[in-house]
């Protein structure tokens, strides 16, 4: 009787269990589906952001008044930013505004957030928060016009100073070389403090209550509790607030355009205002584009530096 060779039978896979290959294929399909879903947004981004940005860089390399034939300028428009005292002053003014748009609002909002959250359900706290946030929802045209009237020689501020016997202090705040830029900066403080306050109140709500209870058991007072628990717990919110307010300070245009037109002289001239003035006022479109590119680079650099600080702090 001939021996029968028995071939090993392959183990049958239980029903309903897929093989590895279809899983891999399915993963690839899902991955490509994700890219396909994002494709419309990427197309919109390229059409409305990347293409104009490329054209902006291209125009910045030419001398052009917006009408006649352009001539090659190379990097002349960029070197002019370093040579022109007015442009250098404009960038310096932007960094000064960071103090008013970022540092002061964040410091004040931290204190207000700590105080209002400790106040709990006291009557009027929610109304106070809403009033602080109100400038964020008011149109900039309205804000600039209102503050121009407040700062006017016969405005509310000077009238109040004269009423309390400080007539020597009264002045045209937006028309004085020494006070014009700080006056604009204080408007920025009034605008940004509400945004920072909302961020910090939301952040405090995410801090575990056990940390505050442990601090109280250790005998920590309100100040020590703020620095030991609240401030470390708001690192992420502080980073977001700092990023948004720094960008707001550097790209300020409409406030200066309505309130001062860059004056008196160039005391409140800013890069964003110079972009508009050179492109539509003096016909220096190439120079305006170069300033815009430089300003964009500064904003991206500062944003990168601010966001890079947070992970390093979290690791420590």
What are these regions (language model features)?
Residues 1-21:
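Short, intrinsically disordered terminal tails adjacent to the first/last structured region
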Residues 3, 23-26, 54-55:
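Gly/Trp-centered helix-boundary motif
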Residues 14, 29, 164-166:
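Short, aromatic- and cysteine-enriched interfacial helices/patches
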Residues 18-24, 255-258:
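Short glycine/proline-rich turn/loop motifs
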Residues 22-36:
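A detector for short, charged/polar N-terminal pre-domain segments
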Residues 33-316:
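A structural signal for multi-pass alpha-helical bundles of membrane permease subunits
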């Amino acid at each position: 009787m001939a021996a029968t060779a028995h071939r090993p039978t392959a183990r049958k896979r239980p029903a309903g269990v897929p093989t590895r290959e279809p899983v891999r294929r399915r993963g690839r399909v899902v991955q490509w589906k994700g890219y396909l879903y994002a494709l419309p947004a990427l197309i919109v981004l390229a059409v409305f952001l990347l293409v104009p940005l490329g054209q902006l860089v291209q125009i910045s390399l030419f001398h052009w008044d917006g009408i006649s034939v352009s001539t090659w300028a190379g990097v002349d428009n960029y070197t002019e930013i370093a040579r022109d005292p007015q442009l250098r002053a404009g960038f310096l003014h932007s960094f000064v505004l960071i103090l008013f748009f970022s540092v002061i609002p964040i410091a004040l909002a931290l204190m207000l957030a700590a105080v209002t959250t400790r106040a709990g359900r006291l009557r009027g706290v929610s109304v106070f928060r809403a009033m602080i946030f109100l400038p964020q929802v008011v149109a900039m045209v309205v804000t600039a016009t209102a503050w121009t009237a407040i700062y006017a020689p016969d405005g509310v501020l000077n009238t109040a100073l004269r009423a309390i016997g400080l007539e020597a202090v009264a002045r045209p705040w937006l028309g004085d070389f020494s006070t014009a830029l700080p006056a604009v900066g204080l408007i920025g403080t009034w605008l940004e403090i509400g945004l920072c306050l909302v961020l910090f109140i939301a952040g405090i709500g995410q801090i575990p209550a056990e940390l505050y209870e442990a601090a109280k058991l250790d005998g920590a007072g309100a100040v020590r509790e703020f620095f030991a628990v609240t401030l470390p717990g708001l690192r992420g919110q502080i980073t977001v607030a700092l990023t948004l307010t720094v960008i707001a300070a550097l790209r300020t245009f409409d406030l200066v355009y309505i309130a001062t037109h860059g004056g008196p002289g160039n005391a409140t001239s800013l890069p964003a205002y110079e972009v508009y003035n050179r492109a539509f006022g003096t016909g220096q479109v190439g120079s305006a584009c170069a300033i815009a590119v430089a300003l964009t680079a500064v904003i991206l650099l500062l944003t990168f530096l601010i966001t890079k600080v947070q992970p390093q702090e979290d690791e420590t």
